[in-house]
């Protein structure tokens, strides 16, 4: 927002509020669940502390679960969400919000996914093999982290979901670049007015 303010000659708070309004408009409608073959995994954002490895309980890290349609040779649509922990309840949020019950789902062997098999009949777990069995998913995780660092530099736990919504709004419309701006403007017009106090 500092860069936006300097470039367009407005106050930093004005630029910040406008950016947040844009991100609000980019939020998923949850009306178009992922279908066919879907891969799911988790990752962390934050500074690792000494002695912390794997799925740690560190307060220094932000935990995210990601789901991605897998199409032959390329990725389809995707979604992600900040989660509290790696429990079945937390992981299940992205399934409920963004994955079709008929999808063919693949995850790694983490035990938190096992209870979800009861609700999703086409569910497979296989070893990650250090990411080798989920290459496309890990590419998208790296792409998101690079985008977050390169474009926004910093975010906190309270705003990370908004950056995630922004990223996947763009990602899911890569094939519709000519209409993405018009789509976004229409969303912003239809939204109820947003004030600084309402999103502070």
How would you label these PLM feature ranges?
Residues 1-200:
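Residue-level recognition of single "structural anchor" positions
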